[in-house]
Curated annotation (Swiss-Prot):
One Pfam entry name: UvrC_RNaseH_dom
Localisation per UniProt entry: Cytoplasm
Record-given protein name: UvrABC system protein C
GO molecular function term, any single one: excinuclease ABC activity
Domain of life of the source: Bacteria
Gene, per the UniProt record: uvrC
Biological process, per Gene Ontology: nucleotide-excision repair; SOS response
GIY-YIG domain location: 15-92
Assembly description: Interacts with UvrB in an incision complex.
Residues in UVR domain copies: 202-237
General function of this protein: The UvrABC repair system catalyzes the recognition and processing of DNA lesions. UvrC both incises the 5' and 3' sides of the lesion. The N-terminal half is responsible for the 3' incision and the C-terminal half is responsible for the 5' incision.
The keyword DNA damage appears for this protein: yes
Length: 609
C-alpha cells in the first residue's frame, strides 16, 4: 500500500503480529521487519526523531506491505524467509553459501572407513559435526587416525591391497586391508572413536586402562605401552578442549564492530569439545547497532537449510540479545526442537563469551585489512592499464576441454573484498565444433550477458579473457551484438615459452600490448584471477568428462538398460552419489545382483579424475 497519507495509512494497520515489507519507487523490497504489533511498530518509522540510517531508508520508501501472522513466532520465521527471498539492502544479510563438512564413519562396512564428507546425509553410517570448515575436519581426521588408527582409504583401494600402505608405516592405520587386525579388534577401535566423538572420553580412558593392565599382566609390554600413550593423549586433549559445566552441543556467538563494519565468530562446541570456529561478515547497513545485527543474524543462520538439521542445544551470545525469549521460542518452533539461548555473562560460559568476542574482533580486523588490500590492488590495475574509471568488479572467462571433449567455460568474479564465489558460473558448451575455442567463448559470453542485460545480476567494470587478441575480438563482438556498453574488455595471453611472469596484456581499442613488471601488484592480481578461472574451468571439465564416460560405460554393461540405469540414479540421487557408493550399497538396489553391482562399481571408478 502506498503511503501518500501516512496518518490514514497507519490507521488501517492491524494491531496483531506480522511482517512488514518496505518498497522503493520501483517496487523493490528494501527492508523487511517483524512486529508483535504491526500498527505500533510501523508507526515508529513516521516519528520526527529517527537515526540517520532509518532516515536514509524512509526517504526511499514509497509503499509498505504487511502480512498478518497467527502469532509472534510465525512473524519471526516469516521475516527470516522474506529476508532470504528478497535480500533487502537495509537488512543485515548473511553471506554463507556453503554447506558444512562432516566426518563420516561408514559403520555398515566390515572395516568402517572414516573420511571427510560434505553434502546431504544420505549414505548409511554415522556423521560427526558439522565442522566450521574443511581445515577443522582434516585436523580432527588426523587426530582420530593418530588415536584410533581407522582407515581412510576408498573401497577400491582397500580391496586391492596386497601390502600395507604408508598410513600403516606411520602408525595411522592398523592395515585391515591385509589382515593385520581382525574384525573384532578393529570394531573395538571404531567403538572407541565413536565414544570420543560423543565426548565420552572418560569411558574410553577406562576401557584403555583395563586393556593396558591386561596386556601388562600377559607381559605384552609393547601393546601396554601403546594403550598408555593413547591414554596420555586423551587426557591431554581433555585439559585443552573440555568446557567447564557440560558436555553438550553449544554454539557461542561473538560479535564485534569496527569503522561501521560488523563481524561475527561462532565457536562450535560438540560433545564438550571445541572443534573450531568460523567468522561471518554479513552485509550490514551503516549505522546498524550490534544488538540489531545479532537479532537479524541468528534467525537467518539457524533457519538456513545449509545447517542440514544440525542445531545445538544451546546458543550463547557475547552481547545482550533483544527479544531473546521471542527468538528462542520462534526458533524452537521453526526447527521443531527445544533450543535455549543465553546472553548473560556468567559461569560457565563467561570465558567462552569473551573468547568468541575476541575471535570476532580479530577476524573483522583481518577482513577489513584484506578488503583494503584488495581495493588497493584494484586501484593498481586501473592505474597500470590506464583505465578511465575505478574498478569494483572484474569477471574472467576461461575455456577447458580435452581434444574438444566435454568443453566447459568458466566465469569467476572478483570484487573489492576478493573472490565472490556465489557469483561464479560454469557453462557446459554444446552445439559448437569440438576444439573451437572461439565458438565456445562466444556461447558462454552470450549466455552470461543476455541474463545480465535482462537484470539478472551486475555488469562488471572489467571483463578479462584468458587468451589473446582473437579471444578479445570475440568478446567485443558479442557485447556489441547484445548492446552491452560500459564494460572494459581486457585479455591476458601466455608469453614466450608459456613462462609465468612473461604474459602479455591487451585492452580492446588499443593497438599496443601491455607488459607489466613481474613484481607489479596489479599484474599479480590479474594472474590470480586468471588462475582461478583456469582452476574452476578445469575442475568443471574433469567432472563433466568423468560423468560422460561413466554414463557411456554404464550403457555398455550387460544387464543395464535405460530403465535400470534410471532406477540406479534415482535410488542414489544422482551419478555423483552412485560413484561414492560401495559394492555392498549398490547391491542393495532392488534387482541388482552382487555380480552386477561389482560391474557397476568398476565402471564408476574406471574413469575417475
Amino acid at each position: 500500500m502506498t503511503i501518500d497519507n501516512p496518518s490514514a495509512f497507519l490507521k488501517t494497520l492491524p494491531t496483531g503480529s506480522g511482517v512488514y515489507q518496505m518498497q522503493d519507487a520501483q517496487g523493490k523490497v528494501i527492508y523487511v521487519g517483524k512486529a508483535r504489533n504491526l500498527q505500533k511498530r510501523v508507526s515508529s518509522y513516521f516519528r520526527r526523531q529517527l537515526d540517520s540510517k532509518t532516515q536514509a531508508m524512509m526517504a526511499q520508501v514509497q509503499s509498505i506491505q504487511t502480512t498478518i501472522t497467527r502469532n509472534e513466532n510465525e512473524a519471526l520465521l516469516l521475516e527470516a524467509s522474506f529476508i532470504k527471498q528478497f535480500r533487502p539492502r537495509y537488512n543485515v544479510l548473511l553471506r554463507d553459501d556453503k554447506s558444512y563438512p562432516y566426518l563420516y564413519l561408514a559403520t555398515h562396512q566390515k572395516f568402517p572407513r572414516l573420511d571427510f564428507y560434505r553434502g546431504a546425509k544420505k549414505a548409511p553410517g554415522r556423521y560427526f559435526g558439522p565442522y566450521p570448515n574443511a581445515g577443522s575436519v582434516r585436523e580432527n581426521l588426523a587426530l582420530i587416525q593418530k588415536l584410533f588408527k581407522l582407515r581412510q582409504c576408498s573401497e577400491s583401494f582397500f580391496k586391492n591391497r596386497t601390502r600395507p600402505c604408508l598410513q600403516y608405516q606411520i602408525k595411522r592405520c592398523t592395515a585391515p586391508c591385509v589382515g593385520y587386525v581382525n574384525e573384532q579388534e578393529y570394531r573395538r577401535q571404531v567403538e572407541d572413536a565413536i565414544l570420543f566423538f560423543e565426548g565420552k572420553n572418560d569411558q574410553v580412558i577406562i576401557k584403555l586402562t583395563e586393556r593396558m593392565e591386561v596386556a601388562s599382566e600377559n607381559l605384552v609390554f609393547e601393546e601396554a605401552a601403546h594403550y598408555r600413550d593413547q591414554i596420555r593423549q586423551l587426557r591431554r586433549l581433555q585439559k585443552q578442549q573440555i568446557i567447564t559445566g557440560g558436555k553438550g552441543n553449544i554454539d557461542i556467538i561473538g560479535i564485534a564492530e569496527s569503522n561501521g563494519a560488523i563481524g561475527f565468530a561462532i565457536l562450535f562446541i560438540r560433545s564438550g569439545r571445541m572443534i573450531g570456529h568460523k567468522p561471518f561478515f554479513p552485509n550490514t547497513p551503516l549505522g546498524t547497532t550490534l544488538q540489531t545485527a545479532l537479532v537479524e543474524f541468528i534467525p537467518q543462520y539457524y533457519l538456513s537449510p545449509l545447517r542440514n538439521g544440525d542445531i545445538p542445544e544451546r546458543i550463547v551470545t557475547s552481547e545482550p540479545l533483544e527479544d531473546r525469549l521471542w527468538i528462542q521460542r520462534a526458533l524452537s518452533s521453526g526447527l521443531n526442537r527445544k533450543l535455549a539461548i543465553t546472553d548473560q555473562k556468567r559461569a560457565p560460559y563467561k570465558q567462552w563469551q569473551a573468547m568468541a568476542a575476541l575471535n570476532a574482533a580479530q577476524a573483522l580486523s583481518q577482513h577489513l585489512a584484506q578488503k583494503n588490500t584488495f581495493a588497493l590492488k584494484l586501484e593498481a590495475i586501473q592505474k597500470s592499464l590506464a583505465l578511465p574509471n575505478p574498478i569494483a568488479r572484474i569477471e574472467c572467462f576461461d575455456i577447458s576441454h580435452t581434444l574438444g571433449e566435454a568443453t566447459v567455460a568458466s566465469c569467476v568474479v572478483f570484487g573489492e573484498e576478493g573472490p565472490i564465489k556465489k557469483d561464479y558460473r560454469r557453462f557446459n558448451i554444446s552445439g559448437v565444433t569440438p576444439g573451437d575455442d572461439y565458438g565456445a567463448l562466444r556461447q558462454a559470453l552470450t549466455r552470461r550477458y543476455v541474463r545480465l542485460k535482462e537484470g539478472e545480476g551486475i555488469l562488471p567494470d572489467v571483463l578479462l579473457i584468458d587468451g589473446g587478441m582473437g579471444q578479445l575480438r570475440q568478446a567485443a563482438e558479442v557485447l556489441e551484438e547484445l548492446q552491452v556498453s560500459g564494460v572494459i574488455l581486457t585479455a591476458i595471453a601466455k608469453g614466450p615459452g608459456r613462462k609465468a611472469g612473461l604474459e602479455k596484456l591487451f585492452v580492446w581499442g588499443r593497438r599496443e600490448e601491455i607488459h607489466l613488471p613481474a613484481d607489479n601488484i596489479a599484474f599479480h592480481l590479474i594472474q590470480q584471477i586468471r588462475d582461478e578461472a583456469h582452476r574452476f574451468a578445469i575442475t568443471a571439465h574433469c567432472n563433466r568428462r568423468a560423468k560422460r564416460r561413466v554414463e557411456s560405460t554404464l550403457q555398455e554393461i550387460e544387464g543395464i538398460g535405460p530403465k535400470r540405469r534410471q532406477k540406479l540414479l534415482k535410488y542414489f540421487g544422482g551419478l555423483q552419489e552412485l560413484q561414492r557408493a560401495s559394492i555392498e550399497e549398490i547391491a542393495r538396489v532392488p534387482g541388482v545382483s552382487e555380480t552386477l553391482a561389482k560391474a557397476i562399481y568398476d565402471a564408476c571408478h574406471q574413469h575417475k579424475g
